[in-house]
Amino acid sequence: MTMRRIDLQPLEPFTSDFIDRTGAFNPGALEAATAIIEQVRRDGDAALRALTEKFDGVAIENFRVPGEAIDAAMAEVDPDTLEALKHAAAQIRDFHERQKQQSWFFAREDGAIVGSKVTPLESVGIYVPGGRALYPSTVLMNALPAQVAGVERIVCVTPPTKDGTLDAAILAACKIAGVTEIYTVGGAQAVAALAYGTETIRPVAKITGPGNAFVAAAKKLVSGDVGIDMIAGPSEVCVVADETADPRLVAIDLMAQAEHDPLAACYLVTFSDAYADAVEAAIQVPLADSTRADITRTSLDDHGLIVVCTSMDQALEAVNVIAPEHLEMHVEGAMEYLGAIRNAGAIFLGAWTPEAVGDYVAGPNHTLPTGGTARYSSPLSVDDFVKKRSILLDSQADLLIYGMGERAVVQIATHEGLWAHARSVALRLKALLDAEQASVAGSAAAGVEDGEARGE
């Protein structure tokens, strides 16, 4: 196992040319997902059955998981695993409760009322992947923020195992998170069903959750017809390690990411070739014991990169260019560098904060931007499950009181050539001014008549 290595010279910038990223999907996946979506839109449940048998090798008659199966799963799961899931759920719920935003309204000095109304989405579909591993944690990380946001209908779709059933831990996680609408279907066909509906599955407003290249391609294709959280590519970690870091801990943290997927990307940013050699050597021992050694080795060989820097400033700039999904700072005084880190999905500070803690029980969401998208996007949060609407209220008096503001509308709209925009305000102002003048004239006339009546 050998990771690719780059030794930067003093003041040499790290650029995106050094990064060899694998995209979320390829043209072949996009073409296949297009055909699958069309088939599901045309044939509904029949397409889901045919595609599930084709790709998963099992025949499913009823996709909906019955309530008794969900209840039974709670008894089937190892008690320690069940308690761990409950503990994780409590932490995740607590963290996301702190993200909730309230509607607000503000009465300006000119009398207008403006505000923002926060409303939960009506329905959300959560994709929970299968394949190389089973992910009950994905259920918690997607369902609990939606639940905290107030989403009434939360749907889970996940592919069947080889015997046509679902992992009991995934069902237990659904139960813990309050999800009762669960379907045994995966792949691009599940995304299509969530987006457009079938005889069995009603469509949702938004789809969240990670998946393989075909799922990512399907999410891209349905985006716009429904909302999506993000298009997630292969997972990635970047570890910045100085001479105070234990090479064994750095090594196992790189492996913890590499074991996800042969396409997972692992970056080590350090300050000497000797330390880089020590980390690579430290990988060899646990690799021999790993139950996912082949996946881990392929990931590190094909998508591993060591960047040897000459200064911390150079290292942090490399981090910002990589914009990793996960960033671990195995350096002395890690908190001091937080302000210099602009681009990362999640930041793990210090040697005692491994990524695995964030993946499961710390509370922050593990659904994170990948492939450099941390430059402009954020982790999944309660905000992903609400809508915010702007609220405006003007009265007749407001239009007169801040007439300059309304006349500014006329001025800008006229400049932009939008005649009806300008006219819609000008008509209102004219009507109000005419009414005010009529009222003034009426008052004056009444005053004259009153004076004549008194003989003045």
Locate predicted features.
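C-terminal core of ALDH-fold dehydrogenases
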Residues: 321-390
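Short internal beta-strands
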Residues: 152-162, 266-273, 279, 350
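A conserved active-site cap/scaffold subdomain adjacent to cofactor or substrate pockets
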Residues: 230-302, 306
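N-terminal Rossmann-like NAD(P)+-binding subdomain of aldehyde/semialdehyde dehydrogenases
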Residues: 1-122
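Glycine-rich beta-alpha loop elements in corrinoid/cobalamin-binding modules
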Residues: 391-456
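Conserved small-residue-rich beta-alpha loop and adjacent elements
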Residues: 106-172
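Conserved NAD(P)+-binding/catalytic subdomain of aldehyde/semialdehyde dehydrogenases
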Residues: 178-249, 253-265
